[in-house]
């Protein structure tokens, strides 16, 4: 999973590192910057592995679904007699004024496929509770740099797991 980590998102956004100014007055290029930060990533990965803090898990499912205006309706089963959930999505404010619900067969109306069942697939990922609990301990102990590194790694590893699974 670590091979899917977006280093730019981790190093710059989560960890807030920035390129440094070199002795000749120029800034590090992207590769120099990443080469400088990668040892921190390797250290964080090694310590989380040693402590058993990263426990990747995925749950997925396929659900009977229909679009209903700006809502995606999920059904308990293919009979479509009981709604499991209804999720509202924003509609674009400019042409073509699309909404995620538009990409599913409509519940009713004059459109092709109206009234027919459709399906939506979802997956949820986690790196487990242990990394979040450890990050909370670091934060409570005022170890903000350690917290930032661990929390950021947990976030980006979850993103990596989602990318891997997808």
Can you say where each PLM-predicted feature lies in the sequence?
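Active-site loops and adjacent core secondary-structure elements that bind or stabilize anionic groups
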Residues: 1-148, 152
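C-terminal substrate/ligand-recognition segments
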Residues: 146-166
